[in-house]
Amino acid sequence: MENTASAAPPSSEDLVVDTKENAEPPFCGISLSGSSQAPFHPQSPTLQQDERDELILQQSGEQQLGNSGELRQEEELPKTRRGGWTKGRKRKRSPRDNNAPKAPLTGYVRFMNERREQLRTERPDVPFPEITRIVGSEWSKLPAHEKQHYLDEAEKDKERYTKELQQYQNTDAYQTYSRKAQSRQKGRQQRQEGVRGVPINTEKESILKERPIFDIPIFTEEFLNHSKAREAELRQLRKSNMEFEERNAALQKHVESMRSAVQRLEAELNQEQERNSLLQQHLQSVRQALTHCLQSVPIPGTTEIPTLETIDLYMSRLQNAVLTHPKESEVIISGVREVLSQLEG
């Protein structure tokens, strides 16, 4: 019986089960050759589905490889460097015209300067950017009639700036500054044209072409470390920027106070100069009067009489003679007193 059972042909169900057990496992990767494909079994629908899936995966793998090859070819193409400012080179700012009138402030800037100092006094623990944000929010919510006050002041300041600028443009200082600015602009253009006209050395050009492009694959530890370093650098730059803004605000306030102090000192200097000129005129008139009144009073022991040029020396010598010989100089003293009484009258 056992031999008979083993010799009997297998049924269709046994054939399907045996085929499933002996068939190759499902496709787990991308195959580029057709030799590893499973044989075709028309009586097994499961194998047909597996072969279709394998063929689809194979085609998609070939397409991916083709696309990756195209990407490699594109990456291997030399990348031309865009024109622009040279890395690491700083732009030079044009020198400021110190003689020019002060630029006008807008209404918002006036409100911000006034309100910012109040907030820094009331809330010293709040950082500078937060104060700026609070001031901006208050300005947007400020009523129109209160906001109009700052806008009117800004308009007056603008009119003042326009008048002062028109007056300044007619001065020699502005003409000198304008000529210097034009000469600097011409020199800069000539330097740029000279740099463009000089051919690049072939050796330097080959070095630039062979220089590797900084490329880090994503989803790697190196990329994460690079991102962390950049984020730390950005945080440090933001912190430095905030500190510089606060320092700039403090320096701006100090500059304004220094300007007001300079203006006050200039006004005091003008007053003192006017007072000095008046005193100089009065002194000159006193010298003339003394010279005229003391023409007949010589210094004791000499025949020297005063003149307009020697009146100061004459008065000094006369005083020394009177103090040295007071008894002999009583007549001269009485005469000088009469002259001075007439002068005071």
Curated annotation (Swiss-Prot):
Biased composition (Polar residues): 32-48, 57-67, 167-180
Species the sequence originates in: Xenopus tropicalis
DNA-binding region(s) in UniProt: 101-169
Gene Ontology molecular function: any one: DNA binding
Gene Ontology, cellular component aspect: nucleus
Record keywords: Coiled coil, DNA-binding, Nucleus, Transcription, Transcription regulation
Name of the protein: High mobility group protein 20A
Acetylation is among the record's keywords: no
Purpose: Plays a role in neuronal differentiation.
InterPro entries: ChromReg_NeuronalGeneExpr, HMG_box_dom, HMG_box_dom_sf
Top-level taxon: Eukaryota
Biased composition (Basic and acidic residues): 112-124
Ranges annotated as biased composition (Basic residues): 80-94
